[in-house]
Amino acid sequence: RANQVWALDTTYIPMARGFVYLTAVVDVASRRVLAHKVAITLEAVHAKEVIEQAFTRYGVPEIVNTDQGSQFTAEEFTEVVLAKGCRLSMDGRGAWRDNVFVERLWRSVKYERVYLKAYDSVSAARADIADYLSWYNAHRSHSSLERLTPNEKYLAALPPMAQAA
């Protein structure tokens, strides 16, 4: 069901000169991107901000899954998750398959958008990635979701009470 398990990860986004970091929160049941942030540093504060954004918009899941990246093992991040009463699940070190839903998102983001561009500024990367993720949620159907989009699957996977609200 929606909002039961959320997965977080961070990836590098190449630019014309250098790179930025993209962190996202994905609802595992629907593949919907609930929150994201493009930042110029890999710090726990960015992971904290993106999970807080998801909590504010969508409530609190039972489980938050991440890898063992320094931004996710930092107290600044773990305290926020645990204070909400979530169970924090961390993948085995180097075990990318454990977080396959976010890894698959990264493939889509990079091959369907990022690698076709050469962002010349952080603001251009932020705007274009936000545009892509909005499109991804609303229009990118998935064979694993019975050809539904993440938004369609998310709404269908909400508990009945949440749908009525």
Model-derived regions: residue spans:
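Charged DNA-binding/catalytic regions of mobile-element recombinases
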Residues: 1-165
